[in-house]
């Protein structure tokens, strides 16, 4: 599971993301949206007055850097970590970068309001687990097996 791969909806869903966005977008709207939103990475919205949502749940400990935006000419994209607001992007905001810490079970939620379009440019994760376990192994490797975690 790689939450960092935000190329498109299908890949993200396969990697554990959850989404409540419109799927059957008319071709002509899709063409216009592709031009404004850059189809190289994920973008999505809920057609009509309902709020579009995209969510991921983290499995480990670490820090993350998120680059996101709102590629619509109106509305907002808001970001929440564990249901607490951490950032938003207004109209025509192609890129905004934020950093945060996460733990197992932490949730990252995107909402689009007032006809905004959620744009996820990148999500870079730095999991501290591998460093922690390497350290534990190194400090215990000189001891007898009964002391190894």
Predicted regions and their residues:
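Extracellular beta-strand elements of beta-rich domains used
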Residues: 120-123, 128
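Short, surface-exposed tryptophan/glycine-enriched loops
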Residues: 95-107
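Short beta-strand-plus-loop segments that form exposed binding edges in beta-rich domains
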Residues: 110-117
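Short, surface-exposed beta-strand/strand-loop-strand elements in extracellular ectodomains
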Residues: 74-85
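Short beta-strands within extracellular/lumenal beta-sheet-rich domains
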Residues: 38-59, 74, 94-98, 118
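Short, intrinsically disordered C-terminal tails of secreted or membrane-associated proteins
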Residues: 144-148
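Extended extracellular/luminal ectodomain segments enriched in beta-structured repeat modules
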Residues: 58-65, 105
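Extracellular glycan-recognition surfaces and repeat-rich motifs
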Residues: 8-41
């Amino acid at each position: 599971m790689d939450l960092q791969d935000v190329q498109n909806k299908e890949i993200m869903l396969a990697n554990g993301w959850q989404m409540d966005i419109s799927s059957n977008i008319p071709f002509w709207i899709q063409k216009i949206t592709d031009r404004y939103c850059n189809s190289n990475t994920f973008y999505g919205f809920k057609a009509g007055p309902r709020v579009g949502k995209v969510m991921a749940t983290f499995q480990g400990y670490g820090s993350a850097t998120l680059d996101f935006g709102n590629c619509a000419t109106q509305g907002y994209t808001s970001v929440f970590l564990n249901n607490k607001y951490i950032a938003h992007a207004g109209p025509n905001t192609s890129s905004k970068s934020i950093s945060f810490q996460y733990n197992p079970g932490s949730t990252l939620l995107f909402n689009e309001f007032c006809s905004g379009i959620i744009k996820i440019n990148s999500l870079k994760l730095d999991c501290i687990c591998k460093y922690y376990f390497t350290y534990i192994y190194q400090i215990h490797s000189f001891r007898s097996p009964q002391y190894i975690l």
